[in-house]
């Protein structure tokens, strides 16, 4: 059901601190990492074994300002130094898109399409696609 305003203060220390606020930060990433590790057990395309650290390493700095919905835990580095993230690689494998470990328009569009959202390739702050993603992560609904 719907939670009342202010409830995040009460639930922040619970097992699942994720709220559907439309911003993809560390809490969203930890839930994604848990899910990808679970999927890896049944889907050989996904490698799993991800640390539950809430970090998305070595991402293209040029994507940061274009995607204000991506917040805590995202490491933005100069584009020529960006080597990508294992978490994003597994997300890309799961979505069936090109695997380079880097968030960008093609990966975002694939995620948006899977979520039934407009595939515009950007994640606003807040983002309707991130809200839908967070709801799937909270509910454990990945069909």
Predicted regions and their residues:
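Cell-envelope/ECM-targeting effectors and their regulatory/trafficking segments
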Residues: 1-143
């Amino acid at each position: 059901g719907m939670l009342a305003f202010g409830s995040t203060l009460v639930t922040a220390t619970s097992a699942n601190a994720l709220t559907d606020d439309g911003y993809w930060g560390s809490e969203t990433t930890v839930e994604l990492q848990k899910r990808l590790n679970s999927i890896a057990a049944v889907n050989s395309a996904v490698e799993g074994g991800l640390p539950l650290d809430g970090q998305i390493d070595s991402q293209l700095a040029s994507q940061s300002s274009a995607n204000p919905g991506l917040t805590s835990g995202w490491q933005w580095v100069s584009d020529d130094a960006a080597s990508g993230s294992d978490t994003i690689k597994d997300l890309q494998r799961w979505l069936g898109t090109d695997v380079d470990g880097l968030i960008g328009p093609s990966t975002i569009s694939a995620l948006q399409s899977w979520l039934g959202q407009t595939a515009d390739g950007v994640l606003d702050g807040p983002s309707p696609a991130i809200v839908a993603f967070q709801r799937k992560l909270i509910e454990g609904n990945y069909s």
